[in-house]
């Protein structure tokens, strides 16, 4: 385990480094259609989102980690007094191939779908007062009849202002906030326990290998992080070093790792998830259908999925990553700043280092 002093040093370095990386203002490719998201208040902290295809192409949009996902995922960012309210829901890693048809929504040009959700469920709004809600990011897409992610589309919403009743919001937040601290590795018995333990332990040397590759920079680093700048290389390496330290022990550390799904979040298309506010990681049944380490560039496996989830948890390295883009095509379309905050950029880079992609 790291000392408090070393943790504070890493946090200070991360905050300074991320602040020093200017988000790219380069325009996205013209052939990527844009989704418009219209946010309106229904009642209290209940919000409706209307997602519209503003492009001239048909879209088959993945709903996992996006609007229409029934899990407590991050659909919007919430701001109070100019600062973002920390997200307290889950971050999912889902399959990038073999996805079920029901997790996609087809939208022709000009067509829309709706979703309603309570922003107080995944953000502590008990202080009440005025908040601002908005959404911007990338949604994954596939061909109309496909089950493999093949593209990405940018989405952006209006800014919605809501006056929050703190007491009512606190009740909604409490319904998600029912987690307790447990031992480092939990519910891990039998073949699944063996598979998870092996994957966690092998995450340590792979993360260390990725840290070394990040410090050296090169083609793969530039592909995923869009720069060969030394400051960015050091920041990426520091996160991988932290993952390697955390994964080196299954009996101590800053995360609680479940081999099963104690909170009922999993679905057939979800591999694992993290609850960053509690530094909790849980594997889903689909995790165990993956190979231990894939021999396919840009592929998914148990080891890099565990690395993906470790990067989400701020107890390992703060701030934890977000889920901005999934898969090679989407991840390599991100700017440097976005890639530094994207879990799949780290897991895909580790895969590239391991296989020499």
Curated annotation (Swiss-Prot):
<feature type="binding site">
    <location>
        <position position="323"/>
    </location>
    <ligand>
        <name>Zn(2+)</name>
    </ligand>
</feature>
<comment type="similarity">
    <text>Belongs to the peptidase M35 family.</text>
</comment>
<dbReference type="GO" id="GO:0005576">
    <property type="term" value="C:extracellular region"/>
</dbReference>
<dbReference type="InterPro" id="IPR024079">
    <property type="entry name" value="MetalloPept_cat_dom_sf"/>
</dbReference>
<feature type="disulfide bond">
    <location>
        <begin position="266"/>
        <end position="284"/>
    </location>
</feature>
<keyword id="KW-0862">Zinc</keyword>
<feature type="disulfide bond">
    <location>
        <begin position="297"/>
        <end position="357"/>
    </location>
</feature>
<protein>
    <recommendedName>
        <fullName>Neutral protease 2 homolog BDCG_00922</fullName>
        <ecNumber>3.4.24.39</ecNumber>
    </recommendedName>
</protein>
<feature type="signal peptide">
    <location>
        <begin position="1"/>
        <end position="19"/>
    </location>
</feature>
<keyword id="KW-0482">Metalloprotease</keyword>
<keyword id="KW-0479">Metal-binding</keyword>
<keyword id="KW-0165">Cleavage on pair of basic residues</keyword>
<keyword id="KW-0645">Protease</keyword>
<dbReference type="GO" id="GO:0004222">
    <property type="term" value="F:metalloendopeptidase activity"/>
</dbReference>
<keyword id="KW-0732">Signal</keyword>
<keyword id="KW-0865">Zymogen</keyword>
<feature type="active site">
    <location>
        <position position="309"/>
    </location>
</feature>
<feature type="binding site">
    <location>
        <position position="308"/>
    </location>
    <ligand>
        <name>Zn(2+)</name>
    </ligand>
</feature>
<dbReference type="InterPro" id="IPR050414">
    <property type="entry name" value="Fungal_M35_metalloproteases"/>
</dbReference>
<feature type="disulfide bond">
    <location>
        <begin position="188"/>
        <end position="259"/>
    </location>
</feature>
<dbReference type="InterPro" id="IPR001384">
    <property type="entry name" value="Peptidase_M35"/>
</dbReference>
<dbReference type="GO" id="GO:0006508">
    <property type="term" value="P:proteolysis"/>
</dbReference>
<keyword id="KW-1015">Disulfide bond</keyword>
<dbReference type="Pfam" id="PF02102">
    <property type="entry name" value="Peptidase_M35"/>
</dbReference>
<keyword id="KW-0378">Hydrolase</keyword>
<feature type="propeptide">
    <location>
        <begin position="20"/>
        <end position="182"/>
    </location>
</feature>
<dbReference type="GO" id="GO:0046872">
    <property type="term" value="F:metal ion binding"/>
</dbReference>
<keyword id="KW-0964">Secreted</keyword>
<feature type="binding site">
    <location>
        <position position="312"/>
    </location>
    <ligand>
        <name>Zn(2+)</name>
    </ligand>
</feature>
<comment type="function">
    <text>Secreted metalloproteinase that allows assimilation of proteinaceous substrates. Shows high activities on basic nuclear substrates such as histone and protamine.</text>
</comment>
